[in-house]
A protein has these predicted regions:
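Periplasmic N-terminal accessory/gating domains of Gram-negative outer-membrane beta-barrel systems
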Residues: 68, 91-111, 121-239, 270-273, ...
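Periplasm-facing N-terminal accessory domains of Gram-negative outer-membrane beta-barrel systems
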Residues: 26-125
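Solvent-exposed loop/turn elements at secondary-structure boundaries
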Residues: 556, 562-566, 575-774, 913-915, ...
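Signature of Gram-negative outer-membrane beta-barrel scaffolds
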Residues: 318-322, 434, 458, 462-583, ...
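Gram-negative outer-membrane beta-barrel transporters
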Residues: 537, 541, 692, 696, ...
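Transmembrane beta-barrel wall of Gram-negative outer-membrane proteins
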Residues: 276-355, 371-395, 399, 570
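C-terminal beta-signal and adjacent terminal beta-strands/loops
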Residues: 696, 710, 808-810, 815, ...
Length: 1005
């Protein structure tokens, strides 16, 4: 989407021309755009010898090229900004156009129509057209100026949600593009992928003031780029120019103007969360400066933003409270060095490191402090060289640092103890609620080299290479001296647990789980690509490309862990200029996109994890009438005066469940990985139509179909390998596909195959209830959608944008996360843990948002006073109702799409898990309610002279304070229990954010 409006200009000289513009989507990870155009005339002589010059309004730099014999010209790889264009012939200026906007990842298309032979002054009208009749990609552009007009929250996710086909509100806080999970997207800043290399639901956090332009890619990427099966947000930061500029802004969201959060109650009417007592005050301010170091040559931009975010949350009937504070600052800057007009060097550095301290209180008394650190320092270097008029080179180096540190003042001396019993009134009964101590550093070092070569008038070749080295340094453990977490459950005699039948030794049992993960892990991904943009005829353009990817991971000991290569991705796009006037097009796109795993899997399975679970009876465990334990625990006093609880462990139940061992940590783990493992991929097909109704209005439609399959997962396999040494239970491969392993068979190495689609659990293994081999289906996800768009561009008075999306996402695999379990560790999800998980998991997936309406707009009441609005209405997501257990396997630990309806309690003599009767619960048959949100804004601007101004704004988000339920407790039974009903079933667990008011002021001079 373009934000520019071009007024009429008078031009003098020999050839009269009319210019018309169209923003053209291009590659999504570029930090630049381009200008291309054509001179049209009935006489070839009027075209020959014409030269085109563009000048960057901000920096004064310029480039000049001569049109070809058909009147075509192209300026690729231009920095984002505003340009003036002039056409000359025989030394005389024949045409000009001012203030042509170049957006990130887009080409502005210029059309010159020669009107006569006489040299005369004519009037030229420039208009912005959102139609590029050569493009087959799907993208949405919006700049900082337009965003400032709208009531949009100051976050990258809020920008992306403006685009059709995107949906928010997912469990992991990220976005879904085209039905994808939140872990399949990428965010780029000036060409560098700043997505977390390990858990890609997060990315580098940059203040809005630092950004200049955004492009949201929702499908149809060219062969230049891959490694994503969702969507992309491509952003560029501000640059300096020949004029010194200074900006100061402040944004305040006071708690006193917020709507009250909902209180949460259990099904008996008891308050469990005092949302109405929660408080959040947010304040940010920034100062920035830009200008020339050397006029026309070297420029700077610098920004500093301190911030203060204070949050108070009250839970559990006012018994516990948390107070969080973040007062860290952001700094960032950019240097642009124009070595010559044909060679540009850019350097960007910023730090988004954030430290948050959270004090926890129980019954008014201080208990502990949680310390969290995220973000880090980031660096980008870009070089652009215009080697000839037809050959351009772009080189990029960048480094991203993403810290993820979490610790607590009590973590060394306090084990986490969690009460899962039906009578327990509170969850954490120990002296810490910290999930894990964590000291993780994720780094991404990127290098890429891209070429564009205009071979002939009809063929533009793009080719290049890119490489990423992703490093994860991991040190995580459960809190406590022994890194052990204790979970307390009700024990029902006769029930099966860990391969044994429970007795009446105790009313409770304990799961004691010791877990540590440590080591250095690395993944290297590389790719080469080739693409031809072929102008078949004057009205038909074909984009034909191919991409080759590979990735190679290294485990904790420095040895190879997993390698996947020969990921070949064909891409084909067609675009037809229906009337030959550049105002209507039909386009189609087909392509394959691979999803190499992030570092999440290797960091947990690559030789650096020790995970041991034991089950015990709780000795002398007694609860009072209110559900509090009065015995069964040993109390010790910590140095801070806190009481640490350690369960008194009785008899052990079954054998230890162990993965990894300190004695062999760091050893080669590649023997557990399928020799022929294949990467996940998605095939995508798009058919679309766009047309300009008039100079300001455009409409469009797009249909999309996607199919994602071939997941990589850790799989729990119970199989007799015959004369070969067992590789263990946890193996890594493609569920539902043939797995090949190198095993030691009677002293010789042999390649052994297992079709996991037929056998993941042997029929004679105790885990099989049916007595037959149980295999896993192939994981897959399908998505179909139709987008309808109406766009009225800004004309200094008003603008309007509306979209409607019908979409359907279905299958048995969400993608890189599992919203059903809150697991965001791609490749380490539950889908491979038991074949019944995928057998019963078919249906509408978590990101199936069937209907979405989006509207936004702005209206200038006067030149200084503006009002604006943004509205979103979405149908509810599916609810996946589940219970514990299934009719195929004896595993009664996981929640699956069945519920026990007969023989669900303790088993009598002679009975087994096979006697239980289950009812199937199809995925996603229930739905949440629709959600609605209206945001309103108004701003008033004041000029203090020619170069100074101030803007004061008021934005109200969620005006009507609607707080519809976004998620519910969908578990019919309690954890690790086949027959115990879950008393919290159906309760809302997440809601829309309440109304908030943002006050802001911006001063520029």
């Amino acid at each position: 989407m373009s934000n520019s409006f071009f007024k009429k200009h008078a031009i003098a000289t020999a050839i009269g021309a009319s210019l018309m513009f169209a923003a053209a989507p291009a590659a999504f990870a570029n930090n630049d755009g381009g200008i291309r155009g054509t001179i049209e005339s009935a006489s070839v002589s009027q075209i020959q010898g014409v030269t085109i010059t563009i000048e960057n309004v901000n920096t004064g730099t310029s480039r000049t090229i001569e049109v070809d014999d058909k009147g075509n010209f192209r300026f690729p790889r231009l920095p984002v900004g505003t340009y003036n264009i002039t056409a000359t012939k025989d030394g005389a200026q024949v045409a000009s156009l001012e203030n042509v906007t170049v957006n990130v990842g887009s080409d502005s298309s210029v059309r010159l129509v020669v009107q006569g032979d006489d040299i005369e002054t004519i009037t030229v009208t420039g208009t912005t057209s959102r139609i590029d009749t050569a493009s087959t990609e799907s993208s949405f552009n919006i700049g900082a100026v337009e965003l400032e007009r709208l009531p949009i929250a100051r976050s990258v996710n809020s920008v992306a949600l403006l685009a059709p086909g995107t949906a928010g509100g997912g469990r992991h806080g990220g976005l879904s593009f085209g039905g994808s999970s939140a872990a399949e997207n990428a965010v780029y800043i000036n060409g560098l992928n700043v997505t977390d290399p390990e858990v890609p639901t997060s990315f580098s956090s940059v203040p809005f003031t630092f950004y200049e332009d955004f492009q949201v890619k929702t499908g149809g990427y060219s062969a230049e780029f891959g490694r994503t099966t969702g969507g992309v947000v491509n952003a560029v930061v501000k640059s300096g120019g020949n004029d010194f500029k200074f900006t100061a802004d402040t944004y305040w969201v006071p708690d006193s103007l917020r709507g009250s959060k909902k209180d949460r109650y259990d099904n008996d009417g008891n308050k469990i969360v005092s949302g109405s007592k929660s408080e959040t005050d947010t304040w940010t301010a920034s100062i920035s400066a830009s200008g020339p170091i050397i006029k026309d040559t070297l420029f700077f931009y610098a920004l500093y933003e301190p911030r203060l975010v204070e949050t108070t949350s009250v839970t559990e009937s006012d018994l516990s409270r948390s107070e969080a504070k973040d007062d860290t600052a952001f700094w960032g800057g950019k240097l642009d060095y124009y070595i010559t007009d044909n060679h540009l060097l850019e350097f960007i550095a910023f730090s988004d490191e954030k430290d948050v301290e959270t004090d926890l209180f129980d019954d008014g008394e201080y208990s502990e402090t949680i310390f969290g650190t995220t973000g880090g320092q980031n660096y980008i270097v870009n070089y652009t060289g215009y080697l000839t008029d037809s050959l351009t080179v772009k080189a990029m180096w960048g480094q991203v640092e993403r810290q993820s540190r979490s610790n607590a003042s009590s973590a060394l001396e306090c084990n986490r103890v969690m009460d899962y019993t039906s009578a327990g009134p509170i969850f954490d009964i120990g002296c810490t609620s910290l999930f894990m101590t964590s000291d993780r550093i994720n780094e991404r070092e990127s290098v890429r080299l891209d070429f564009e070569w205009e071979v002939t008038d009809s063929h533009l070749l793009r080719f290049g290479y890119d490489n990423e080295t992703r490093t994860t340094v991991m040190d995580r453990a459960y809190p406590g001296m022994d890194a052990t977490r204790y979970q307390i459950y009700d024990a029902s005699p006769g029930e099966s647990l860990n391969g044994e039948t429970l007795t009446d030794e105790s009313d409770f049992y304990v799961r004691a789980r010791t877990r540590k993960t440590f080591g250095n892990f690395e993944t290297e991904t590389s790719a080469i690509y080739l693409e031809d943009i072929w102008t078949v005829t004057d009205t038909l353009t074909a984009t034909i490309g191919v991409r080759w990817d590979e990735f190679d991971t290294t485990g904790a000991g420095g040895t190879g862990f997993m390698k996947v290569d020969e990921m070949i991705s064909p891409r084909l796009g067609l675009s037809w200029d229906v009337n030959g006037d550049g105002e209507t097009k039909v386009f189609a796109n087909a392509g394959r996109y691979y999803y190499p795993l992030p570092n999440s899997l290797v960091a947990r399975e690559g030789g650096g994890t020790v995970d041991i679970s034991n089950y015990y009876y709780l000795e002398n465990g007694i609860q009072d009438a209110d559900g509090f334990f009065t015995s069964g625990f040993t109390e010790t006093m910590t140095s801070a005066g806190l009481t640490n609880l350690t369960p008194n462990l009785g008899s052990i139940i079954g054998e230890a469940i162990q993965f990894g061992d300190v004695s062999n940590a760091g050893e080669d783990q590649s023997y557990r990985v399928d020799n022929d493992i294949e990467a996940s991929y998605q095939d995508e097909y798009i058919l679309g139509f766009e047309t300009m109704v008039n100079d300001n209005w455009a409409i469009g439609a797009r249909a999309m179909y996607r199919k994602f399959e071939n997941a990589i997962e850790d799989m729990k396999i119970y199989h007799d390998w015959g004369d070969c040494d067992s590789p263990g239970t946890w193996l890594i491969g493609n569920p539902g596909k043939v797995m090949t392993l190198n095993l030691n068979c009677n002293g010789t190495q042999q390649i052994v195959s297992l079709d996991t689609g037929k056998t993941q659990i042997d029929g004679d293994h105790p885990r099989s209830k049916t007595g037959e081999d149980i295999g896993s289906p192939v994981p897959f996800r399908k998505y179909a959608s139709l987008d309808l768009v109406v766009d009225r561009q800004w004309d200094d008075v008003w603008q309007f944008y509306a979209s409607y999306t019908w979409a359907h996402s279905w299958g048995n695999y969400e993608g890189g996360v599992n919203s059903d379990t809150t697991n965001d560790i791609a490749g380490w999800l539950e889908y491979g843990d038991d074949p019944a998980y995928l057998i019963g998991g078919y249906g509408d997936l978590p990101n199936d948002v069937r209907h979405t309406f989006k509207f936004y707009g702005a209206y200038a009441i006067t030149e200084d006073w503006l009002v604006s609005a943004n509205f979103v209405a979405s149908s509810g997501r599916p609810i996946n109702i589940r219970g514990v257990g299934n009719p195929y396997t004896t595993d009664e630990h996981y929640y699956m799409n069945w519920v026990c309806v007969e023989t669900c309690g303790g088993l009598a003599d002679g009975q087994s898990e096979s006697d239980r009767v289950y009812e199937y619960l199809p995925r996603g048959e229930e739905r949440l309610d629709w959600t609605y949100q209206l945001d309103l804004g108004t701003s008033y601007s004041v000029d203090f002279g020619e170069d100074a101004s101030a803007t004061f704004s008021l934005d109200v988000f969620n005006v009507f304070n609607t707080q519809e339920t976004l998620r519910v407790d969908s578990f019919l039974t309690t954890p690790d229990s086949v027959g115990n009903p879950n008393p919290d079933y159906g309760l809302g667990t997440s809601f829309q954010s309440p109304r908030r008011v943002q006050l802001s002021a911006i001063v520029r001079f």
